[in-house]
Amino acid sequence: MYQSGQREIYGINFREGYRANEKLDNVVVTPTTKGEHDHPITPKEIVEQGYLSQEDYDFIEDRALKLFEFGQTEAAKRGLILVDTKYEFGRLPNGKIILIDELHTCDSSRYWLIEDPLEYNLYNPNPKKLDKDIIRDYIKKTDSYNIPEELITKV
């Protein structure tokens, strides 16, 4: 979305000048609807459309940010950068909001190697990725689903 020129995404205004793979100035929560294809939705729309109360949205956003901070800390201890991730929340019959689905797996998250700890926060146009984006990137470049065995092994 950003690469196509949008600067307001998920109700958040992003500054001009971000480069691909550049760390954002702040951690952001980017909610989506759940379906065959996830669609962006703003926090305001979530409340206005009755998906959640403002209080429940604030609770979920707070928990998502805390989980992400925890994930980044744990990843860094292992020489990794937790780039982004997906959290899914649900509600029990008694109304309690809970985290559902997987947490910080390679299927729900993107990880990069910290190649040089001294350059951890510097821009890296070609980070070493440890996730399924390797396969996605190959398919985009070659337009082929004939994925070499060595690439599959790498993933």
What are the residue ranges of the model-derived segments?
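Acidic/polar, glycine-anchored loop/turn motif associated with catalytic or activation segments
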Residues: 1-84, 90-155
